[in-house]
From Swiss-Prot:
It comes from Arabidopsis thaliana. GO terms for biological process: riboflavin biosynthetic process. This is Monofunctional riboflavin biosynthesis protein RIBA 3, chloroplastic. Residues 303-509 are annotated as: GTP cyclohydrolase II. HAMAP family: RibA, RibBA. Residues 1-43 form a transit peptide.
Protein backbone atom coordinates (compact mmCIF):
# COMPACT_ATOMS: atom_id res chain seq x y z
CA UNK A 1 0.00 0.00 0.00
CA UNK A 2 0.91 3.64 -0.15
CA UNK A 3 3.74 4.97 2.02
CA UNK A 4 1.77 7.64 3.91
CA UNK A 5 1.73 9.11 7.38
CA UNK A 6 -1.58 10.91 6.94
CA UNK A 7 -3.92 8.49 5.23
CA UNK A 8 -5.38 5.36 6.75
CA UNK A 9 -4.13 2.20 4.96
CA UNK A 10 -7.65 1.42 3.76
CA UNK A 11 -8.10 4.74 1.99
CA UNK A 12 -7.75 4.36 -1.72
CA UNK A 13 -6.99 6.82 -4.49
CA UNK A 14 -8.17 6.51 -8.07
CA UNK A 15 -5.20 8.16 -9.70
CA UNK A 16 -5.53 10.25 -12.83
CA UNK A 17 -2.84 9.58 -15.35
CA UNK A 18 -1.69 13.19 -15.60
CA UNK A 19 1.69 14.20 -17.03
CA UNK A 20 2.45 10.55 -17.82
CA UNK A 21 2.75 9.72 -14.14
CA UNK A 22 2.51 6.07 -13.21
CA UNK A 23 -0.06 4.37 -10.99
CA UNK A 24 -1.38 0.93 -10.09
CA UNK A 25 -4.57 -0.83 -11.22
CA UNK A 26 -4.53 -2.84 -8.00
CA UNK A 27 -4.43 0.34 -5.93
CA UNK A 28 -7.05 2.10 -8.03
CA UNK A 29 -9.67 -0.62 -7.86
CA UNK A 30 -9.98 -0.75 -4.08
CA UNK A 31 -13.32 0.01 -2.46
CA UNK A 32 -14.80 3.44 -1.81
CA UNK A 33 -14.88 5.14 1.53
CA UNK A 34 -17.31 7.68 2.96
CA UNK A 35 -15.98 10.24 5.39
CA UNK A 36 -19.05 10.93 7.50
CA UNK A 37 -18.49 14.26 9.25
CA UNK A 38 -17.75 16.29 6.14
CA UNK A 39 -19.76 14.38 3.55
CA UNK A 40 -16.61 13.70 1.52
CA UNK A 41 -16.71 10.67 -0.73
CA UNK A 42 -13.80 9.57 -2.84
CA UNK A 43 -14.60 6.60 -4.99
CA UNK A 44 -12.45 4.43 -7.20
CA UNK A 45 -13.49 3.79 -10.73
CA UNK A 46 -15.56 0.64 -11.06
CA UNK A 47 -14.91 0.54 -14.79
CA UNK A 48 -12.02 -1.90 -15.09
CA UNK A 49 -11.82 -1.22 -18.83
CA UNK A 50 -10.87 2.40 -18.28
CA UNK A 51 -7.29 2.64 -19.52
CA UNK A 52 -5.85 5.47 -17.45
CA UNK A 53 -3.04 3.65 -15.65
CA UNK A 54 0.50 2.69 -16.61
CA UNK A 55 0.86 -1.00 -17.32
CA UNK A 56 4.39 -0.96 -15.88
CA UNK A 57 4.27 0.99 -12.62
CA UNK A 58 7.57 1.77 -10.93
CA UNK A 59 8.16 -0.20 -7.75
CA UNK A 60 10.13 0.48 -4.58
CA UNK A 61 13.28 -1.48 -3.85
CA UNK A 62 11.24 -3.77 -1.61
CA UNK A 63 8.87 -4.54 -4.46
CA UNK A 64 5.95 -2.41 -3.27
CA UNK A 65 4.42 0.27 -5.47
CA UNK A 66 4.82 4.09 -5.28
CA UNK A 67 8.41 5.02 -4.55
CA UNK A 68 9.39 8.41 -3.12
CA UNK A 69 9.16 10.05 -6.54
CA UNK A 70 5.53 9.14 -7.12
CA UNK A 71 3.13 12.06 -6.78
CA UNK A 72 0.01 11.13 -8.70
CA UNK A 73 -3.25 13.05 -8.43
CA UNK A 74 -6.63 11.81 -7.29
CA UNK A 75 -9.57 11.01 -9.51
CA UNK A 76 -12.58 11.95 -7.37
CA UNK A 77 -15.74 10.68 -9.08
CA UNK A 78 -17.89 12.29 -6.41
CA UNK A 79 -16.51 15.74 -5.65
CA UNK A 80 -15.63 15.81 -1.94
CA UNK A 81 -17.19 18.82 -0.25
CA UNK A 82 -17.80 20.30 3.16
CA UNK A 83 -19.86 23.29 4.26
CA UNK A 84 -17.72 24.19 7.25
CA UNK A 85 -14.08 25.15 7.52
CA UNK A 86 -14.16 25.58 11.29
CA UNK A 87 -13.91 29.39 11.18
CA UNK A 88 -16.37 32.12 12.07
CA UNK A 89 -17.98 34.35 9.47
CA UNK A 90 -16.25 37.38 10.98
CA UNK A 91 -12.79 35.85 10.72
CA UNK A 92 -12.47 36.49 7.02
CA UNK A 93 -14.18 39.87 6.93
CA UNK A 94 -11.70 42.64 6.04
CA UNK A 95 -13.82 45.06 8.08
CA UNK A 96 -13.58 42.92 11.22
CA UNK A 97 -10.71 44.26 13.39
CA UNK A 98 -7.97 42.12 14.83
CA UNK A 99 -8.89 41.06 18.35
CA UNK A 100 -8.02 43.78 20.85
CA UNK A 101 -8.10 46.59 18.28
CA UNK A 102 -10.68 49.16 17.22
CA UNK A 103 -12.37 49.00 13.84
CA UNK A 104 -11.19 51.23 11.02
CA UNK A 105 -14.66 52.80 10.90
CA UNK A 106 -14.38 53.84 14.56
CA UNK A 107 -11.00 55.40 13.84
CA UNK A 108 -12.42 57.34 10.89
CA UNK A 109 -15.21 58.71 13.05
CA UNK A 110 -12.68 59.90 15.63
CA UNK A 111 -10.52 61.61 13.00
CA UNK A 112 -13.50 63.49 11.57
CA UNK A 113 -14.11 64.88 15.07
CA UNK A 114 -10.54 66.11 15.38
CA UNK A 115 -9.50 63.36 17.78
CA UNK A 116 -6.40 61.20 17.94
CA UNK A 117 -6.02 57.64 16.69
CA UNK A 118 -3.18 55.23 17.50
CA UNK A 119 -1.83 53.16 14.60
CA UNK A 120 0.26 50.08 15.45
CA UNK A 121 2.41 48.60 12.70
CA UNK A 122 2.98 45.04 13.94
CA UNK A 123 0.81 43.35 16.50
CA UNK A 124 3.05 40.28 16.77
CA UNK A 125 6.68 41.39 16.67
CA UNK A 126 8.56 44.54 17.71
CA UNK A 127 5.79 47.09 17.64
CA UNK A 128 5.84 50.76 16.87
CA UNK A 129 2.80 52.90 17.42
CA UNK A 130 2.08 56.46 16.32
CA UNK A 131 -0.42 59.00 17.53
CA UNK A 132 -2.06 60.57 14.49
CA UNK A 133 -4.72 63.16 13.79
CA UNK A 134 -5.91 65.43 11.00
CA UNK A 135 -3.44 68.23 10.29
CA UNK A 136 -6.26 70.55 9.26
CA UNK A 137 -7.93 70.21 12.68
CA UNK A 138 -4.83 70.59 14.87
CA UNK A 139 -4.79 72.86 17.94
CA UNK A 140 -1.99 73.84 20.38
CA UNK A 141 -3.57 71.53 22.96
CA UNK A 142 -3.32 68.61 20.53
CA UNK A 143 0.35 69.32 19.82
CA UNK A 144 1.06 69.53 23.56
CA UNK A 145 -0.51 66.09 24.03
CA UNK A 146 1.48 64.76 21.08
CA UNK A 147 4.77 66.10 22.47
CA UNK A 148 4.03 64.75 25.96
CA UNK A 149 3.16 61.22 24.83
CA UNK A 150 5.24 61.03 21.67
CA UNK A 151 8.88 61.26 20.71
CA UNK A 152 8.92 65.05 20.70
CA UNK A 153 9.23 65.03 16.92
CA UNK A 154 6.09 66.39 15.28
CA UNK A 155 5.73 65.19 11.70
CA UNK A 156 3.24 66.00 8.97
CA UNK A 157 2.40 63.38 6.36
CA UNK A 158 1.96 65.01 2.96
CA UNK A 159 1.46 63.97 -0.65
CA UNK A 160 4.12 64.63 -3.26
CA UNK A 161 2.16 67.40 -4.98
CA UNK A 162 1.82 69.40 -1.76
CA UNK A 163 5.51 69.04 -0.98
CA UNK A 164 6.42 70.22 -4.49
CA UNK A 165 4.00 73.15 -4.24
CA UNK A 166 5.83 74.32 -1.10
CA UNK A 167 9.30 73.48 -2.48
CA UNK A 168 9.97 71.03 0.34
CA UNK A 169 12.84 68.82 -0.77
CA UNK A 170 13.97 65.61 0.88
CA UNK A 171 16.68 65.69 3.55
CA UNK A 172 18.35 62.72 1.84
CA UNK A 173 17.72 62.56 -1.91
CA UNK A 174 18.62 58.85 -1.92
CA UNK A 175 15.44 58.23 0.08
CA UNK A 176 13.56 59.08 -3.12
CA UNK A 177 13.93 55.39 -4.00
CA UNK A 178 10.37 54.07 -4.02
CA UNK A 179 11.59 50.66 -2.90
CA UNK A 180 13.11 52.05 0.29
CA UNK A 181 11.29 51.08 3.48
CA UNK A 182 12.61 54.09 5.40
CA UNK A 183 10.48 57.20 6.05
CA UNK A 184 11.16 60.10 3.70
CA UNK A 185 11.73 63.31 5.69
CA UNK A 186 11.94 66.67 3.96
CA UNK A 187 13.77 69.75 5.20
CA UNK A 188 12.20 70.85 8.49
CA UNK A 189 10.18 74.06 8.63
CA UNK A 190 8.61 76.70 10.87
CA UNK A 191 5.80 79.01 9.82
CA UNK A 192 7.03 82.61 9.57
CA UNK A 193 3.72 84.16 10.52
CA UNK A 194 2.30 83.85 14.03
CA UNK A 195 5.30 82.06 15.57
CA UNK A 196 8.30 83.01 17.70
CA UNK A 197 11.03 80.40 18.20
CA UNK A 198 8.92 77.71 16.53
CA UNK A 199 9.45 75.20 19.34
CA UNK A 200 6.34 75.73 21.49
CA UNK A 201 3.18 73.69 21.06
CA UNK A 202 1.42 76.83 19.86
CA UNK A 203 4.14 77.59 17.30
CA UNK A 204 4.23 74.03 16.00
CA UNK A 205 0.44 73.93 15.74
CA UNK A 206 0.62 77.13 13.69
CA UNK A 207 3.22 75.53 11.40
CA UNK A 208 1.08 72.42 10.94
CA UNK A 209 -1.93 74.54 10.00
CA UNK A 210 0.20 76.59 7.60
CA UNK A 211 1.39 73.41 5.87
CA UNK A 212 -2.27 72.39 5.57
CA UNK A 213 -3.37 75.64 3.98
CA UNK A 214 -4.29 75.60 0.31
CA UNK A 215 -3.00 79.18 0.09
CA UNK A 216 0.43 78.43 1.54
CA UNK A 217 3.51 79.38 -0.49
CA UNK A 218 7.17 78.34 -0.20
CA UNK A 219 8.12 81.73 1.25
CA UNK A 220 5.72 81.26 4.16
CA UNK A 221 8.24 78.98 5.94
CA UNK A 222 11.67 79.21 7.53
CA UNK A 223 14.12 76.40 6.94
CA UNK A 224 15.21 74.53 9.04
CA UNK A 225 12.50 74.46 11.65
CA UNK A 226 10.76 72.31 14.26
CA UNK A 227 8.13 70.45 12.20
CA UNK A 228 9.12 67.49 10.03
CA UNK A 229 7.17 67.03 6.78
CA UNK A 230 7.11 63.42 5.55
CA UNK A 231 6.56 62.31 1.99
CA UNK A 232 3.63 59.95 1.47
CA UNK A 233 4.31 57.24 -1.09
CA UNK A 234 1.67 56.94 -3.81
CA UNK A 235 -0.42 53.85 -3.19
CA UNK A 236 -0.30 54.32 0.56
CA UNK A 237 -0.16 51.26 2.78
CA UNK A 238 -0.70 49.06 -0.25
CA UNK A 239 2.70 50.21 -1.51
CA UNK A 240 4.55 50.84 1.78
CA UNK A 241 3.26 49.61 5.13
CA UNK A 242 4.45 52.67 7.07
CA UNK A 243 2.92 55.11 9.53
CA UNK A 244 3.15 58.03 7.11
CA UNK A 245 1.14 56.13 4.52
CA UNK A 246 -1.29 54.81 7.14
CA UNK A 247 -1.96 58.26 8.54
CA UNK A 248 -2.63 59.88 5.16
CA UNK A 249 -4.71 56.92 4.00
CA UNK A 250 -6.90 57.29 7.07
CA UNK A 251 -7.41 61.00 6.33
CA UNK A 252 -8.48 60.18 2.77
CA UNK A 253 -10.85 57.45 3.96
CA UNK A 254 -12.31 59.87 6.51
CA UNK A 255 -13.04 62.39 3.76
CA UNK A 256 -10.44 64.86 5.07
CA UNK A 257 -7.59 66.57 3.26
CA UNK A 258 -4.60 64.23 2.82
CA UNK A 259 -2.43 65.76 5.55
CA UNK A 260 -1.75 64.14 8.90
CA UNK A 261 0.07 64.95 12.13
CA UNK A 262 1.93 62.04 13.69
CA UNK A 263 4.52 61.15 16.29
CA UNK A 264 5.91 57.84 17.57
CA UNK A 265 4.71 56.89 21.06
CA UNK A 266 7.35 56.51 23.79
CA UNK A 267 7.14 54.92 27.22
CA UNK A 268 7.17 57.90 29.58
CA UNK A 269 8.96 55.92 32.29
CA UNK A 270 12.16 55.03 30.45
CA UNK A 271 11.92 56.75 27.07
CA UNK A 272 11.89 53.49 25.11
CA UNK A 273 9.50 52.72 22.28
CA UNK A 274 6.13 52.03 23.83
CA UNK A 275 5.03 48.42 24.12
CA UNK A 276 1.66 47.28 22.88
CA UNK A 277 0.23 46.97 26.43
CA UNK A 278 1.46 50.50 27.15
CA UNK A 279 -0.24 51.85 24.03
CA UNK A 280 -3.47 50.03 24.79
CA UNK A 281 -3.45 51.51 28.29
CA UNK A 282 -2.90 54.99 26.82
CA UNK A 283 -5.75 54.41 24.39
CA UNK A 284 -8.09 53.33 27.19
CA UNK A 285 -7.18 56.24 29.50
CA UNK A 286 -7.79 58.85 26.80
CA UNK A 287 -10.56 57.12 24.84
CA UNK A 288 -8.42 56.87 21.70
CA UNK A 289 -9.17 54.22 19.06
CA UNK A 290 -6.18 51.95 18.42
CA UNK A 291 -5.98 50.25 15.04
CA UNK A 292 -3.67 47.74 13.41
CA UNK A 293 -1.88 48.72 10.23
CA UNK A 294 -2.60 45.20 9.00
CA UNK A 295 -6.33 45.84 9.43
CA UNK A 296 -6.01 49.09 7.46
CA UNK A 297 -4.32 47.23 4.61
CA UNK A 298 -7.14 44.67 4.55
CA UNK A 299 -9.72 47.47 4.69
CA UNK A 300 -8.19 49.20 1.70
CA UNK A 301 -7.73 46.02 -0.29
CA UNK A 302 -11.45 45.40 0.01
CA UNK A 303 -12.36 48.84 -1.33
CA UNK A 304 -9.63 49.80 -3.80
CA UNK A 305 -9.61 48.45 -7.34
CA UNK A 306 -6.29 46.66 -7.35
CA UNK A 307 -6.28 45.03 -10.78
CA UNK A 308 -7.05 45.82 -14.38
CA UNK A 309 -7.96 43.28 -17.01
CA UNK A 310 -5.40 43.31 -19.83
CA UNK A 311 -6.76 40.74 -22.27
CA UNK A 312 -8.67 37.47 -22.69
CA UNK A 313 -7.54 34.68 -24.98
CA UNK A 314 -8.59 31.16 -25.96
CA UNK A 315 -6.24 28.61 -24.36
CA UNK A 316 -6.41 24.93 -25.34
CA UNK A 317 -4.81 22.75 -22.63
CA UNK A 318 -4.20 19.04 -22.12
CA UNK A 319 -7.30 19.03 -19.91
CA UNK A 320 -9.51 20.89 -22.35
CA UNK A 321 -10.36 24.34 -23.67
CA UNK A 322 -10.16 27.30 -21.26
CA UNK A 323 -10.28 31.07 -21.58
CA UNK A 324 -7.16 32.79 -20.20
CA UNK A 325 -7.77 36.13 -18.44
CA UNK A 326 -4.68 38.28 -17.80
CA UNK A 327 -4.81 40.88 -15.01
CA UNK A 328 -2.18 43.45 -14.06
CA UNK A 329 -1.77 44.61 -10.47
CA UNK A 330 -2.08 48.37 -10.08
CA UNK A 331 0.24 48.15 -7.08
CA UNK A 332 3.38 46.64 -8.59
CA UNK A 333 2.59 45.75 -12.20
CA UNK A 334 2.63 41.99 -11.59
CA UNK A 335 0.57 40.08 -14.15
CA UNK A 336 -1.62 37.22 -12.93
CA UNK A 337 -3.74 34.76 -14.89
CA UNK A 338 -7.13 33.15 -14.42
CA UNK A 339 -8.23 30.15 -16.48
CA UNK A 340 -11.99 30.03 -16.94
CA UNK A 341 -13.89 26.95 -18.06
CA UNK A 342 -17.35 27.28 -19.54
CA UNK A 343 -19.86 30.03 -18.91
CA UNK A 344 -19.75 31.61 -15.46
CA UNK A 345 -23.32 32.78 -16.01
CA UNK A 346 -24.90 34.20 -12.86
CA UNK A 347 -21.70 33.52 -10.92
CA UNK A 348 -23.35 31.19 -8.44
CA UNK A 349 -21.86 27.91 -7.18
CA UNK A 350 -18.65 28.15 -9.22
CA UNK A 351 -15.90 25.60 -8.65
CA UNK A 352 -12.77 27.67 -7.90
CA UNK A 353 -9.12 27.03 -7.22
CA UNK A 354 -6.91 29.96 -6.13
CA UNK A 355 -3.40 28.60 -6.66
CA UNK A 356 -0.20 30.16 -5.32
CA UNK A 357 2.75 30.23 -7.69
CA UNK A 358 5.25 27.43 -7.05
CA UNK A 359 7.88 27.26 -9.78
CA UNK A 360 9.59 24.18 -8.37
CA UNK A 361 6.37 22.22 -7.93
CA UNK A 362 4.20 23.47 -10.79
CA UNK A 363 6.88 23.49 -13.51
CA UNK A 364 9.68 21.17 -12.41
CA UNK A 365 7.57 18.60 -10.57
CA UNK A 366 9.27 18.97 -7.18
CA UNK A 367 8.50 16.09 -4.83
CA UNK A 368 9.08 18.32 -1.79
CA UNK A 369 5.56 19.76 -1.97
CA UNK A 370 2.10 18.90 -3.30
CA UNK A 371 1.61 22.12 -5.29
CA UNK A 372 1.93 20.69 -8.79
CA UNK A 373 -0.38 17.81 -7.97
CA UNK A 374 -2.98 20.19 -6.55
CA UNK A 375 -2.90 22.34 -9.69
CA UNK A 376 -3.24 19.30 -11.94
CA UNK A 377 -6.15 17.97 -9.91
CA UNK A 378 -7.90 21.35 -9.90
CA UNK A 379 -7.65 21.62 -13.68
CA UNK A 380 -8.98 18.10 -14.11
CA UNK A 381 -11.92 18.55 -11.75
CA UNK A 382 -12.93 21.85 -13.35
CA UNK A 383 -12.74 20.27 -16.80
CA UNK A 384 -15.00 17.45 -15.60
CA UNK A 385 -17.41 19.94 -14.05
CA UNK A 386 -17.50 21.91 -17.29
CA UNK A 387 -17.57 25.20 -15.39
CA UNK A 388 -15.05 26.77 -13.04
CA UNK A 389 -12.05 29.04 -12.52
CA UNK A 390 -8.39 28.55 -11.64
CA UNK A 391 -6.71 31.76 -10.43
CA UNK A 392 -2.91 31.56 -10.57
CA UNK A 393 -1.30 34.14 -8.27
CA UNK A 394 2.30 35.15 -8.85
CA UNK A 395 4.47 36.50 -6.06
CA UNK A 396 3.34 33.73 -3.70
CA UNK A 397 6.47 31.60 -4.12
CA UNK A 398 7.30 29.77 -0.89
CA UNK A 399 4.16 31.12 0.83
CA UNK A 400 5.31 34.62 -0.07
CA UNK A 401 9.02 34.51 0.84
CA UNK A 402 10.31 34.24 -2.73
CA UNK A 403 12.21 31.60 -4.67
CA UNK A 404 15.67 32.25 -3.23
CA UNK A 405 14.47 32.16 0.36
CA UNK A 406 12.44 29.04 -0.39
CA UNK A 407 15.53 27.22 -1.60
CA UNK A 408 17.41 28.35 1.52
CA UNK A 409 14.54 26.98 3.58
CA UNK A 410 14.90 23.67 1.72
CA UNK A 411 18.51 23.47 2.90
CA UNK A 412 17.37 23.99 6.49
CA UNK A 413 14.71 21.32 6.04
CA UNK A 414 17.41 18.91 4.91
CA UNK A 415 19.19 19.69 8.19
CA UNK A 416 16.12 18.74 10.22
CA UNK A 417 13.90 21.83 10.35
CA UNK A 418 10.30 21.55 9.24
CA UNK A 419 8.80 24.04 6.77
CA UNK A 420 7.61 26.37 9.55
CA UNK A 421 10.82 26.21 11.57
CA UNK A 422 12.89 26.92 8.46
CA UNK A 423 11.03 30.16 7.74
CA UNK A 424 11.38 31.27 11.36
CA UNK A 425 15.10 30.45 11.33
CA UNK A 426 15.49 32.70 8.28
CA UNK A 427 13.60 35.49 10.02
CA UNK A 428 10.73 35.24 7.55
CA UNK A 429 6.97 35.03 7.82
CA UNK A 430 5.45 31.56 8.01
CA UNK A 431 2.84 32.62 5.45
CA UNK A 432 2.69 36.16 4.07
CA UNK A 433 0.36 35.51 1.14
CA UNK A 434 -2.55 37.88 0.58
CA UNK A 435 -5.54 36.97 -1.55
CA UNK A 436 -7.21 40.32 -2.26
CA UNK A 437 -5.85 40.40 -5.84
CA UNK A 438 -7.29 36.95 -6.50
CA UNK A 439 -10.62 37.93 -5.00
CA UNK A 440 -10.88 40.97 -7.25
CA UNK A 441 -10.01 38.88 -10.29
CA UNK A 442 -12.83 36.48 -9.41
CA UNK A 443 -15.24 39.38 -8.96
CA UNK A 444 -14.32 40.83 -12.35
CA UNK A 445 -14.84 37.44 -14.01
CA UNK A 446 -18.32 37.35 -12.50
CA UNK A 447 -17.95 34.86 -9.64
CA UNK A 448 -20.26 35.55 -6.70
CA UNK A 449 -20.53 32.28 -4.78
CA UNK A 450 -17.99 29.49 -5.01
CA UNK A 451 -16.98 26.04 -3.94
CA UNK A 452 -13.35 26.55 -3.07
CA UNK A 453 -10.79 23.83 -3.76
CA UNK A 454 -8.36 24.07 -0.84
CA UNK A 455 -7.08 22.42 2.31
CA UNK A 456 -5.91 25.75 3.74
CA UNK A 457 -8.13 27.70 6.17
CA UNK A 458 -6.12 30.90 5.56
CA UNK A 459 -7.07 30.81 1.89
CA UNK A 460 -10.70 30.31 2.80
CA UNK A 461 -10.75 33.31 5.14
CA UNK A 462 -8.54 35.38 2.85
CA UNK A 463 -11.16 35.35 0.08
CA UNK A 464 -14.14 36.21 2.25
CA UNK A 465 -15.40 39.76 2.55
CA UNK A 466 -14.69 40.88 -1.02
CA UNK A 467 -18.24 40.48 -2.23
CA UNK A 468 -17.62 36.74 -2.55
CA UNK A 469 -19.28 33.94 -0.63
CA UNK A 470 -17.65 30.56 -0.08
CA UNK A 471 -20.55 28.11 0.02
CA UNK A 472 -18.51 24.92 0.18
CA UNK A 473 -15.05 23.47 0.29
CA UNK A 474 -13.61 20.85 -2.03
CA UNK A 475 -10.55 19.22 -0.43
CA UNK A 476 -7.60 18.86 -2.78
CA UNK A 477 -6.49 15.36 -1.82
CA UNK A 478 -3.22 14.22 -3.38
CA UNK A 479 -0.87 11.36 -2.45
CA UNK A 480 1.71 11.64 0.26
CA UNK A 481 5.26 10.63 -0.67
CA UNK A 482 8.45 10.00 1.24
CA UNK A 483 9.73 13.43 0.18
CA UNK A 484 6.67 15.53 1.05
CA UNK A 485 5.24 13.58 3.99
CA UNK A 486 6.82 15.74 6.71
CA UNK A 487 5.94 18.93 4.82
CA UNK A 488 2.26 18.00 4.65
CA UNK A 489 2.20 16.74 8.23
CA UNK A 490 3.64 20.10 9.36
CA UNK A 491 1.00 21.99 7.40
CA UNK A 492 -1.67 19.90 9.11
CA UNK A 493 -0.28 20.24 12.64
CA UNK A 494 1.09 23.78 12.63
CA UNK A 495 -0.88 25.60 9.94
CA UNK A 496 -4.30 24.03 10.34
CA UNK A 497 -4.54 22.38 6.93
CA UNK A 498 -7.32 19.83 6.79
CA UNK A 499 -6.66 16.33 5.48
CA UNK A 500 -8.10 12.92 6.33
CA UNK A 501 -7.08 11.36 9.61
CA UNK A 502 -4.85 8.31 9.58
CA UNK A 503 -6.78 6.90 12.54
CA UNK A 504 -10.44 7.66 11.96
CA UNK A 505 -13.02 8.94 9.51
CA UNK A 506 -13.03 12.56 10.69
CA UNK A 507 -11.56 15.55 8.85
CA UNK A 508 -8.57 17.01 10.65
CA UNK A 509 -8.96 20.55 11.95
Amino acid sequence: MMDSALYHPRIFFAHSFINGLYSSPRFANTCWRLVSRSSWEIKASENSDRNVFDENPVRKTDGSLFDSASFETVDAEITPETDDFFVSDAEGDPDCPTQGYSSIELALQALRKGKFVIVVDDETGDVEGNLIMAATLTSPKDIAFLIKNGSGIVSVGMKKENLERLSLTLMSPEMEDEDSSAPTFTITVDAKSGTSTGVSASDRAMTVLALSSLDAKPDDFRRPGHVFPLKYRDGGVLRRAGHTEASVDLMILAGLRPLSVLSAILDQEDGSMASLPYMKKLATEHDIPIVSLTDLIRYRRKRDKLVERITVSRLPTKWGLFQAYCYRSKLDGTENIALVKGNVGNGEDILVRVHSECLTGDIFGSARCDCGNQLDLAMELIEKEGRGVVVYLRGHEGRGIGLGHKLRAYNLQDEGHDTVQANVELGLSIDSREYGIGAQMLRDIGVRTMRLMTNNPAKFTGLKGYGLAVVGRVPVVTPITKENRRYMETKRKKMGHIYISDNNDQPLA
